[in-house]
From Swiss-Prot:
GO terms for cellular component: plasma membrane. PANTHER family: MAJOR FACILITATOR SUPERFAMILY MFS_1 (PTHR23517:SF13), RESISTANCE PROTEIN MDTM, PUTATIVE-RELATED-RELATED (PTHR23517). InterPro entries: MFS (IPR011701), MFS_dom (IPR020846), MFS_trans_sf (IPR036259), MFS_Transporters (IPR050171), MFS_YhhS-like (IPR023008). Pfam families: MFS_1. The chain crosses the membrane at residues 19-39, 47-67, 85-105, 107-127, 156-176, 178-198, 224-244, 252-272, 283-303, 309-329, 344-364, 366-386. Keywords: Cell inner membrane, Cell membrane, Membrane, Transmembrane, Transmembrane helix, Transport. The gene is yhhS. This is Uncharacterized MFS-type transporter YhhS.
């Protein structure tokens, strides 16, 4: 975790501008993820002639690589400082574009082309975990740990913005110049971000002996479990809301997803200081309550407007869960371990979103689509109870010896 430089208090606008000047590098990394997202499955299946399994695998490889590399990203951010980790991650994003470019140039050799695509996706996953984790810690180093919740919130906003922009733009670039043109755009985005990041001042890494991974996991896993349980609500809406609307015979599933995204981003923009004012655990419990109401409304909806209100509430409720619990999780370890803590905490959300789809699919095939929203509400209720117990637990003293050694 970087050592923040002591400075006079910043007003809200200047504070946000400083944060955005750093998290824009995460925006760039997620833009390189969003640009090919709507293109590659169709390219692998329809153009290259491979099965739907391979089309899905090409996309999934990035998420597996992100999941496996995220703990290493946090550890190296603590050891080397976040700026180096961000630049390393952006280089991975650049190399992923190079992989797509060479895959397009070797289209006459389908197996080679597919392997190059897969390699590019793996490199992108590693790059994203390093750029995402590093940009959060870099932002905290610039504005101070008091504002870690705001930094995490802004990182989420730029993530959603980049993904929302990237997918349609990627389709436009692909229709304009094929996979090679799309690859060059991705390489250009990453290269511009690298050139902007390199001249920026470096934030010093914290001194001190780092805790082993097992010790970090032991301090953050309960917060991670609450996050994982709450993420099930997001997972079932993002994955199955279209099937839910089809089962009901309604139109407007895409608009429901738009409502979720607007509520998610809007809540983060409307309540930037909520975590600092009333505490991360209090914010999390309020968010869980709102998310539960939203999921229950979707599950029992008999009219489209009920489902839309439910999705809106679920998006607003889930919005601040990650930063609210993340602030408390990161502060549960010494400063020199906070990068590893943030990365480890994030893994719980990655795992949750990975297993929610297939598990909810099994429940849906057995009991129907609406039941998965009621089940997700039950999981969020467990997260609420867990967070309430964490709030009642006496605070754990963080040993200073480790941070001053």
């Amino acid at each position: 975790m970087p050592e923040p430089v002591a400075e006079p208090a910043l007003n809200g606008l200047r504070l946000n501008l400083r944060i955005v000047s750093i998290v824009m590098f995460n925006f760039a990394s997620y833009l390189t993820i969003g640009l090919p997202l709507a293109v590659l499955p169709g390219y692998v299946h329809d153009v290259m002639g491979f099965s739907a399994f391979w089309a899905g695998l090409v996309i999934s490889l990035q998420y597996f690589a992100t999941l496996l590399s995220r703990p290493h990203a946090g550890r190296y951010a603590d050891l080397l400082g976040p700026k180096k980790i961000v630049v390393f991650g952006l280089c991975g994003c650049f190399l992923s574009g190079l992989g797509y470019l060479t895959a397009g140039l070797t289209a006459s050799l389908p197996v080679i082309s597919l392997l190059l695509l897969c390699l590019g996706r793996v490199i992108l996953g590693i790059g994203q975990s390093f750029a995402g984790t590093g940009s959060t810690l870099w932002g905290v180093g610039v504005v101070g740990s008091l504002h870690i919740g705001r930094v995490i919130s802004w990182n989420g906003i730029v993530t959603y913005g980049a993904m929302a922009m990237g997918a349609p733009l990627g389709v436009v670039f692909y229709h304009w110049g094929g996979l090679q043109a799309l690859a060059l755009i991705i390489m250009g985005v990453a290269l511009v971000a690298i050139l902007l990041a390199i001249p920026r001042p470096t934030v010093k890494a914290s001194k001190g002996k780092p805790l082993p991974f097992r010790a970090v996991l032991g301090r953050v896993w309960l917060y991670g479990m609450a996050l994982a349980l709450a993420s099930a609500g997001f997972g079932v809406i993002a994955t199955f809301i279209t099937l839910f609307y089809d089962a009901k015979g309604w139109d407007g599933a895409a608009f429901a997803l738009t409502l979720f995204s607007c509520a998610f981003v809007g809540t983060r923009l409307l309540f930037p200081n909520g975590i600092n004012r009333i505490g991360g655990l209090n914010v999390a419990m309020i968010c869980f309550s709102v998310e539960i109401i939203g999921l229950l409304l979707v599950g029992v909806a008999t009219m489209p407007w009920m489902a839309k209100i439910g999705v809106l509430l679920a998006g607003a409720g889930f919005s601040l869960v990650f930063p609210a619990l993340g602030v408390v999780a990161v502060k549960a370890v010494p400063q020199q371990n906070q990068g590893a803590a943030l990365a480890t905490y994030t893994v719980f959300m990655d795992l949750s979103l990975g297993v929610t789809g297939p598990l909810a699919g099994l429940v849906m095939s057995w009991a129907g689509v609406p039941v998965i929203y009621l089940a997700a509400a039950g999981l969020v209720a467990i997260a609420l109870l867990l967070t309430w117990r964490l709030k009642k637990r006496p605070p754990v003293e963080i040993p200073e010896a480790a941070s001053s050694s």
